[in-house]
């Protein structure tokens, strides 16, 4: 096993074969695997509305920008045409977005206390996603692909359905059985 390059270019630290990295958005794939494991066990169905497990996602609204070319012009809301499903979250077509895209939802998310999706939230995923559920969607569920906090909602769903924290579920059900001893939810100092 060989390593190449630098683990830290600024410090001049060389890469080692056993260097540890944050996996960042690769957790999306792991969270999706967790959801599919729960489906295999009959604990949920991807066609289920999210509100079946997280009631705050019931009766959502959708933003209708007053001027689609000007996000600062404000918006009105209309009822969602249907409920957001687990499948919508898996395919990033729920209408949920990220704050950092700078779209019409950015200011609403920030004012509503929704995380930016880049910073660690200290294990408060469900608290944050319940806040998100009370805010309007950017698009009608299932209508538009919009990369966003969908997997964060799925992480909350895994916690609710399994009764375990997401890091514990990952460790007990995925990482340990696969012998992934160097893969952790949080990197120890």
How would you describe each model-predicted region?
Residues 1:
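Mature N-terminal segment immediately following signal peptide/propeptide cleavage
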Residues 35, 170, 179:
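Active-site-flanking alpha-helical
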Residues 32-33, 152, 168-169:
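A generic alpha-helix surface/boundary motif
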Residues 4-146:
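Active-site-proximal loop and beta-strand segments within enzyme catalytic domains
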């Amino acid at each position: 096993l060989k390593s190449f390059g630098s683990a830290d270019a600024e410090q001049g630290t060389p890469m080692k074969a056993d260097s540890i990295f944050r996996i960042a958005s690769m957790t999306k794939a792991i969270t999706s695997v967790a959801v599919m494991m729960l489906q295999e066990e009959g604990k949920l169905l991807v066609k289920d509305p999210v509100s079946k497990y997280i009631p705050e996602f019931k009766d959502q609204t959708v933003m209708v920008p007053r001027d689609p070319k000007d996000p600062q012009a404000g918006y009105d809301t209309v009822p969602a045409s249907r409920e957001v499903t687990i499948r919508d979250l898996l395919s990033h077509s729920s209408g949920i977005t990220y704050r950092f895209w700078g779209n019409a939802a950015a200011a609403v998310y920030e004012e509503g206390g929704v995380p930016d999706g880049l910073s660690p939230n200290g294990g408060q995923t469900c608290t944050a996603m319940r806040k998100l559920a009370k805010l309007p969607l950017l698009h009608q569920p299932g209508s538009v692909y919009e990369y966003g906090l969908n997997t964060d909602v799925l992480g909350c769903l895994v916690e609710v359905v399994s009764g375990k924290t997401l890091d514990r579920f990952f460790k007990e059900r995925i990482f340990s059985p696969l012998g992934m001893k160097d893969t952790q939810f949080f990197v120890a100092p």
